[in-house]
Amino acid sequence: MRIEAKNLVKIYGDRCVVNDNSFYIDKGEVVCLLGPNGAGKTTTFYMIVGLVKPNSGEVFIDGTEITNWPMNLRAKAGIGYLPQENSIFRKLSVEDNIKLVLEMNEKLTVNEKKNKLEELLDEFGVTRLRKYPAVALSGGERRRVEIARALAASPDFMLLDEPFAGIDPIAIGEIKDNIRKISEEKGLGVLITDHNPKATLSITDRAYVIFDGKIKIQGKSVDVANDPVAKEFYLGKDFQL
């Protein structure tokens, strides 16, 4: 199963911010979109999410074109999305945040939903926090609950917008472990865009680097991390994984 973008173009006024970008994400792999500020990576990412419509080009999931589908239909097709902004329901408890999504999951029986709740609480290390109001969580705890809640919908793919933003180094390590686990053990495809290239490249299988609206470098993350052009224009000459 694959998400594929073909020849995406986005123009605002007289400026082409995304220029003919094509890429893909398969189930079971972690892929990232990277680039300097203003390069077009976020706009490219949002065209996969469904927040931005391209001027031209197409987006497919499992061979079905979804270019003009709204986000709710993309979710039903198996695409989960975690925004950078705080998306947790602050007045609800941790378990009620997850239950809310589980109750809408038509793929699971009542008993399966109960088991899934316990599984997600345990997997993301928040069982002891299950009765806590979400407003009382730290940044790292909140992010783990948000990922668990997104997984409650049983997606095939997860699109993560700035998953490492606003959390401390220890929490970043925990989130990295969670991302690898959902890819390797659950078989989900994961697409990440983030301003932390070291954390992102260290857990991704493949990377696309965008300059001036165009994908200029792509390949295995370890190769991209050592690419001289990527270091010159984005990563910095002393960058190391």
Regions found by a protein language model. Give the residues of each.
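Conserved structural motif at the start of ABC-family nucleotide-binding domains
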Residues: 3, 18-20
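Conserved ABC ATPase signature
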Residues: 133-137, 141
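Catalytic Walker B motif of ABC-type/P-loop ATPase nucleotide-binding domains
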Residues: 158-162
